[in-house]
Design a protein with these regions (language model features):
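Long, compositionally biased, intrinsically disordered segments
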Residues: 1-250
Length: 250
């Protein structure tokens, strides 16, 4: 669903605010491909493991809709639920996931940044791994990368169901979106637990992982897109990526 944002000076509020539904959209599957796994050195997986890349596309004609989108558009899709075996969040099998982006107002001409590579699916336990979660922007905007807590969403596990329809989304939606709850021993600062490490270089998205615990983990990356307009630095877009990593003995 798409929700209108009426305040161009406060795109991602510190306190929870509700925004009206601008409209609904249905995305069509445009391509399905098996991609090569770019594992770190010494990390191998069985021949029966496949990673699929699925692309969804649609065209939407955005408009201001009587002023409700003076501050842009929040695009969100929620899905239930996660793998029961994820180590670092509470009740993963009952926790949803949310795909989110913010598009600037219609009087801003903009192209969102595109990630240059697929996320790394596997890392080796007890070994430091670096990976690129970088992106390019055809407009030449400044991109600032950071790691964030993955998004749970504003629904419960049973609402929406797995086969959610666009019309199931409520007439108002809360921003910031609710985040996952970390399990005991894990946190935003330590998503891999005690002794683990996770960092993202703000200028280029270079990401470093380290975990001495094996299992499945989820982490998040956020891109904020800035542009100078008439001497002012303005936020022009927000893009998120969530990564599920399998930490294994190599």
């Amino acid at each position: 669903a798409i929700y209108g944002h009426d305040d161009p000076l406060n795109v991602i509020p510190d306190n929870v605010s509700s925004y009206p539904k601008w409209g609904e959209l249905t995305l069509d599957v445009s391509s399905v491909n098996i991609i090569d796994i770019d594992n770190p050195p010494g990390c191998s997986v069985g021949a029966d493991i496949c990673v699929y890349e699925v692309e969804y596309t649609t065209i939407v004609d955005l408009n201001n809709n009587n002023g409700i989108a003076n501050g842009g558009f929040h695009v969100t899709h929620e899905r239930c639920c996660r793998n029961n075996s994820i180590e670092n969040i509470s009740d993963p099998g009952g926790t949803g996931m949310t795909y989110y982006a913010w598009i600037p107002p219609i009087f801003f001409n903009n192209t969102s940044p595109e990630f240059t590579n697929s996320p790394l699916p596997f890392i080796c336990s007890g070994d430091t791994t670096t990976a690129l979660n970088t992106a390019t922007d055809v407009d030449g905007d400044e991109l600032i990368f950071s790691y964030v807590t993955p998004l749970k969403g504003n629904f419960t596990a049973a609402n929406p169901p797995q086969n959610i329809n666009p019309s199931d989304y409520p007439e108002t939606y809360s921003i910031p979106i609710a985040e996952v709850q970390y399990g005991p021993g894990y946190s935003y600062e330590s998503p891999f637990g005690a002794g683990g490490y996770y960092s993202v270089v703000a200028s280029n998205g270079l990401t470093t992982y380290y975990s001495n615990i094996q299992g499945k983990f989820v982490v998040g990356v956020l891109i904020k897109e800035y542009r100078e307009v008439n001497g002012q630095i303005l936020l022009y877009g927000v893009t998120t990526r969530e990564v599920q990593l399998i930490v294994q003995n190599c």
